[in-house]
């Protein structure tokens, strides 16, 4: 992850998660480790998948104690298998025990998203279609989840509401129609801002093309209607398919010739990748 992003955004989010988990005291750790004791603990994969979030994992321990260190056997984007040794954390035993759950929560979540994204992106090989995520992210986790999508081989759609214009059904209703919504967006937003509009039928697509939308999203349209829409657009706008996308239908959608396929499932439905910290070893011989 970008070091500036890590410092300005990610550190605060990790600290918030640590405060949520530790609050006043880790009573379990304080009971068995009342004083500082050097130790190591091993990071082990318990399932097959793609690793993502190693820097966030390491940073969690560093924020608790700058003297903590992590040595990894893999890098973000690498494939791991059940039983693989992924890395070792070294530091005060109290820090290793207290930071374990938060660090693993980030790593498991990000690795799960990267794994699912990798599986979906693999189905698009040989096509021009780019797999993108959505804003359907866990509150407070967007920066991590979108980073995981990229590590898994996908791309990011707009990061937040200020990044691009995305006119959905309620925006169109509020504006009074497709053409009016696009015209109002052009008048308000910077000339550098991309204007995308969601269309549910061919009439909406035709109107969006005529007014000059940059990207036209086909929202839950039939396969035949999307094929007709792409022919109608004829390269005058980028095209995006969204809605009910899964591993079973993503290739057929890409074969239509759409530029982008967006899937909220990348972030809201990906299962975690099972990882564990095991075999804590005290180094002071006591």
Tell me the role of every PLM-derived stretch.
Residues 2-211, 215, 227-232, 238-241, ...:
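Acidic/glycine-rich phosphate/pyrophosphate-binding loops and surrounding catalytic core
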Residues 1-4, 284-286:
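Basic/polar N-terminal segments that are highly enriched at the extreme N-terminus
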């Amino acid at each position: 992850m970008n070091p500036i992003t890590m410092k300005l955004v990610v550190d605060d989010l990790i600290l918030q998660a640590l405060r949520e988990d530790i609050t006043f005291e880790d009573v379990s750790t304080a009971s068995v480790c009342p004083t500082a004791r050097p130790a190591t603990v091993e990071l082990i994969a318990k399932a097959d998948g793609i690793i993502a979030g190693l820097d966030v994992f390491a940073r969690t321990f560093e924020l608790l104690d700058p003297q903590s260190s992590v040595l990894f056997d893999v890098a973000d984007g690498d494939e791991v298998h059940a039983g693989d040794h992924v890395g070792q954390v070294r530091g005060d035993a109290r820090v290793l025990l207290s930071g374990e759950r938060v660090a693993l929560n980030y790593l498991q979540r990000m690795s799960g998203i990267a794994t699912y994204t990798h599986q979906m992106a693999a189905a698009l090989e040989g096509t021009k279609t780019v797999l993108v995520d959505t804003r359907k992210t866990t509150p407070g986790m967007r920066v991590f989840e979108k980073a995981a999508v990229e590590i898994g081989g996908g791309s990011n759609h707009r990061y937040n509401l200020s990044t691009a214009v995305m006119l959905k059904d309620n925006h169109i209703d509020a504006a009074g129609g497709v053409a009016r919504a696009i015209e109002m967006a052009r008048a308000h937003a910077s000339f550098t801002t991309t204007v995308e509009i969601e269309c549910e039928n061919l009439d909406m697509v035709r109107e969006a093309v005529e007014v000059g939308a940059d990207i036209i999203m086909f929202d839950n349209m039939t396969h035949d209607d999307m094929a007709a829409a792409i022919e109608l657009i004829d390269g005058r706008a980028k095209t995006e398919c969204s809605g009910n996308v899964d591993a079973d239908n993503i290739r057929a959608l890409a074969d239509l010739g759409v530029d982008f396929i967006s899937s909220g499932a990348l972030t809201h439905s990906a299962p975690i990748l099972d990882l564990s910290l095991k075999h804590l070893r005290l180094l002071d011989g006591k």
